[in-house]
């Protein structure tokens, strides 16, 4: 790289692992990484937090937004519609509490995570919090008799899948609670199984059940899911995380339920079993994005193969330019401890290095003792990992992967990201209504943050799904003269960037705008020094 001219501001971006990012080979890139190099100022990876009892008050939600939460996830495997409606209200109240300052305002998206066609156990002794100890070698009867629905104990376990006796064989395994408890089927009757406890432990109420290898014939969208999705449309959620997606037609079913009123809701398919991994390409095509749901996936396929599935899915999503979320057990130990294990720190960083657009927290924020610390930890790790990306190689490969496209917006996006590397731009400013222009730029993974200015609130909230997009909502009325309206929005982005420390006077930014009103006309690129 040639040295920047002396009249150019000393953009912070020139120091961050830049030496490593521009290496010629991957080995050389690794050799040049430097622990004393500062991290990226703007975090490019989205942080998704599951909201539960530990985090649903407006006060804690405000702190979580300050700490870096971009998307609030509501898990519909638990809780009533009233409970979730209140949580959504609280998330929005917390978000709007920052609305008076357009520079500091951060739109937060709401995601509905469906229960999906899952199998769950009944209540232990009639209580949601009771637990029983299952001893290794003990006999446990699994029954479909509804008399035991709320009377499970260490001898009898009820579950809600009526065809279990048809799909499992003697010698099959039944896993409960993310695989913590494993049962071996010894004999089967018409409506019961006799199993031996292979791996014991304490069993709580309403735990998930996995039947690896069994051809489970549950519908893609259950009756409960239909009610939940309709509730989501009424509540104006921004995205749906669809559980246990096995094929493209499952995604179409979810879309059908969302209907005309929910047509702008993004559908993120959760890949949680062998069939989903096998039919990944058709699912990716039908979806707006993908979640690598490592919890159930790690039971349905061997645990030592999960990383292969993760890398394959992230790679294919990056190639297709669709968002991908890495989830489950990212900072699991922080449910009970204030610091993560070294392995967890590594895991979060490697998910970012693999190319994940977003990283997710589940129990850490929903029920953990340290919800804020977990968000801050993900924020810090993501910034370090982003600085350490092998940007030069990544950009070359992304361009090579899409060289035959004649899409004008794609050409603009590619050109602007290339220019941002050449002039060491501190940010890319994109004016967008539908968000498409910003998504295309994000696809080429610039080092610098993409400040996307929009008047559409939903566009701003959904932009968090894409790596590198920093959405800014313009609340000023549209100016009559198009050129003045463009200047108004670019100035807003400049002010936000300066206030957030992304750049300062004299740095260079790249500005992408349309030369006339109307969606789809982002076709002008300017290289502008920051005033």
Curated annotation (Swiss-Prot):
Its EC number is 2.7.1.40, 2.7.11.1, 2.7.10.2. There is a cross-link at residues 115, 266, 270 (Glycyl lysine isopeptide (Lys-Gly) (interchain with G-Cter in SUMO2)). There is a cross-link at residue 166 (Glycyl lysine isopeptide (Lys-Gly) (interchain with G-Cter in SUMO1)). The keyword Ribosomal protein does not apply. It comes from the Eukaryota. The modification N-acetylserine is found at residue 2. Keywords: Acetylation, Allosteric enzyme, ATP-binding, Cytoplasm, Glycolysis, Isopeptide bond, Kinase, Magnesium, Metal-binding, Methylation, Nucleotide-binding, Nucleus, Phosphoprotein, Potassium, Pyruvate, S-nitrosylation, Transferase, Translation regulation, Ubl conjugation. The modification N6-succinyllysine is found at residues 66, 166, 322, 498. The modification N6,N6,N6-trimethyllysine is found at residue 3. The modification N6-acetyllysine is found at residues 62, 89, 166, 266, 270, 305, 322, 475. Pathway: Carbohydrate degradation; glycolysis; pyruvate from D-glyceraldehyde 3-phosphate: step 5/5. The modification Phosphotyrosine is found at residues 105, 148, 175. The modification Phosphothreonine is found at residues 41, 195. ATP binds at residues 75-78, 120, 207. L-serine binds at residues 70, 106, 464. The modification Phosphoserine is found at residues 37, 97, 100, 127. Residues 307-531 are annotated as: Interaction with POU5F1. Mg(2+) binds at residues 272, 296. GO terms for molecular function: ATP binding; magnesium ion binding; mRNA binding; potassium ion binding; protein tyrosine kinase activity; pyruvate kinase activity. There are 4 isozymes of pyruvate kinase in mammals (L, R, M1, M2) encoded by 2 different genes: PKLR and PKM. The L and R isozymes are generated from the PKLR by differential splicing of RNA; the M1 and M2 forms are produced from the PKM gene by differential splicing. L type is major isozyme in the liver, R is found in red cells, M1 is the main form in muscle, heart and brain, and M2 is found in early fetal tissues as well as in most cancer cells. Catalyzes the final rate-limiting step of glycolysis by mediating the transfer of a phosphoryl group from phosphoenolpyruvate (PEP) to ADP, generating ATP. The ratio between the highly active tetrameric form and nearly inactive dimeric form determines whether glucose carbons are channeled to biosynthetic processes or used for glycolytic ATP production. The transition between the 2 forms contributes to the control of glycolysis and is important for tumor cell proliferation and survival. This is Pyruvate kinase PKM. It comes from Felis catus (Cat).
